[in-house]
């Protein structure tokens, strides 16, 4: 039975991808082993051993609490002032019961970074080797996990960490924007780079 045009094109693309993979094999970012055709950027063994933070399961975690302390310090008190209590800031007392905090911002990381662990090659390749596709891939991986948790479903926007313009000019990209793009794709919400 003859194949349809789309089936023939898909089969042809798979053959071309297999030939390219034979000539220029794709390898796991973490361990360097050759990837199977179904694997992207990381092999199944390394993906199974990835030291996941599971921060996405908790609305309050070490990362988000530190992030919100920075928000409070910079937005409410100024960069060098110590945190104020509600009675010291009467205009904020009605806005935040029990404390003078900005609305809570969630934060999560996919995996724990250790300088000596082989997983250090993931951010290294994204940041210094220009592996933007890996950034998007791991962003989608985190985004899929975030969307399983109720407290992330009200997220409205993703804001990547800005990169100083001289570094962005030298590198040609901001790795945080690549990760944010993957997050946005998985979560169905926009990214703001401005």
Q: Which positions does each model-derived feature cover?
A:
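Glycine-rich phosphate/pyrophosphate-handling loop used in enzymes and phosphotransfer proteins
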Residues: 1-194
